Amino acid sequence: MRQSRRKDWIERLLLILLSPLTQAATFDCTIEPGSDDAIGKAHYRIWIPEETPELRGIIFRQHGCGQGARKLGLEHADDIQWQTLAQKHGFALMGSQIWAPEEDCSTWTMPEDGSANAFLSAIKLLARASGHAELDQVPWCLWGHSGGAIWTVNMAYLFPERIIAAFPRSGGLSPAGTTYTRSTPQKPGSNKATLKVPILFCYGKEEYQSGNRFYDLIAGVHEVFEFGRKHHAPWALAVHPDSEHENSQSRQLAIRYFDKIIPARLPDPAHPKNKIQVLKTLPTGKHWIGLHESLETFEASNLQSNLHKSSYLLNKTLATDWESFCQNGHIPDTSPPTPPHNLRVEQEQYRTKLQWNAYADMESGIQSFRIYRKGKLIGEIAGVLNRQWNPTGAYQAWNYSDQPLHGRELLPMVFTDGNAANAQPEDYHVSTVNKEGLESKRTQGISMKTWSVRNKSVWTNLSDTDFLTHWEGP
C-alpha cells in the first residue's frame, strides 16, 4: 500500500473510532505463509465491541480439521452469543480460516509449523487496522475444536504468559501414538509455566469408546490432563454425555468457564499500557473439586490424593455448572435475557416498520423476539428450522463445529405491522426470549425521527483498501 494512501486511510479510520457513538466493527486480514511455513494462506477476522475504548483481551476460536470446519471458520467471530461474552469483558472476538496443503491439517495444528506466526502477525495487522494498538499486548482466551483443540493446547505450552484460559474441545497435545514429520507436539512436562494456565478439557462421551475413530485423540487428552493434575495444575475435564465429536451444547460450559476465569486472572485495570500484562495465578485451597467417577463436587480442602481423577473448579458456581453439564449435557439458565434496545418505529400510512438491536443471552442465546402492540402479542421473529441443528427454529443456532448455523446471516431484527391504524410509536414493545423460554422486560418504541436526531453517527466503507475489509453495524 502506498504511504499516502495508508495515511489517508488511517485518518479516515480514526475519525470513526474516535466518534462518541462508536459501533461494533469487524476487520478481516490475510497472512501469506513464510518460506519455512508448512501452512497455506491464513485468514483472520476480528470483531471489536462497541463503546470499548481500550480492549483488555482477545477470545480466539480456532476451527478444526477439514474443509467443512475451515469453510465457516471466520464466522466464529460473528457468533452473537460469544460476542456478548466478549462485550461484557471488553474483549475482541476472533476467528480464523487456515488452509492446509492437501488437507493435511497437521501442517497447522503444530503451531511452530507456521500457524503461531500467522496468528501473531494477524494480531499485529489487525491492531494497526482497527486503531486498537493494545491488541498486540493483551492476553488471550483460546478455544479450539478437534485439530483446533490440539493447536490450543500446544499454544498453551508455547505462550503460557499470554493465555488467560483455554477450552480445548476434543483434543490434547496430540493423538496418542501419533508421529509428525515436522515439528513435534510439546511434552506434558516441557513447560512448568503452562501448569499455571487454567484449562478445561472437554470431549464427547462416545469418543472415548473402544473402536471409535477419535479414541486415540481422546487418549491424548488424558495423557496431558492427568500429568497436569498430578502436578496440581488448575485444570478440569468435562465429559459431554450423549455426545461424540460434535460440539453440541458444550458452549454452555465454555462461555461460563471463560466468564468466571477472566476476572480472576486479569490484572488491575490500572496496569501500565504497552507492556505484556502479568496474569494472576488462580488460588489454591479455596477452590472446588469435581470427582470424575461420581461427579460429586466439594471444597478442595477435602481432597488430598488422586488429583488426576478430579477437576479444579474455581468456585461453587462453576462447580455446579460442571456437575450439571457432566450429568445432563445441559446447564440450566434461570435468568431472563437483557431486553432489546434502540426500538425504532417508522410509520407510513397504515404500515408500521419496527427495527431494534439486541444482545444475545450469554448463557443460552436467543430463541425469538416477541412483538407487542398496546400490550397484545402481534408477532414473533425466530429462526430457520433445521432438523439436526435447529429443531426448535431458534433465532440463533450453531453447527457441528460450534459455528453460526450454515454461515447464514441472522434474520434482521425487523417487523412490519400491516394493521397499525391509530397506533403510536410508544404503543409498540419488543422483548427477547432465550432458549430456556425466559422472556426479558419489554422495550418501548420511539419514533425513527426522534431516534435519528439522538443518534447521528458516521458510516464509512473501507473495503477498497488493499488488505482488509472493515464495516460497522449494531
Describe each model-derived feature in a short phrase.
Residues 108-132:
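Alpha/beta-hydrolase active-site loop
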Residues 52-56, 62-103, 209-211:
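Short substrate-entry loop that stabilizes the transition state in hydrolases
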Residues 22-58, 89, 140-155, 159-161, ...:
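A domain-start/cap signature at the N-terminus of enzymes
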Residues 368-423:
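Recognizes extended acidic, P/S/T-rich segments that occur
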Residues 328-365, 440-473:
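Pro/Thr/Ser/Gly-rich low-complexity, intrinsically disordered linker/stalk tracts
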Residues 417-436:
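Beta-strand-rich modules
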Residues 164-165, 170-251:
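The feature captures the conserved acid-bearing segment of alpha/beta-hydrolase catalytic domains
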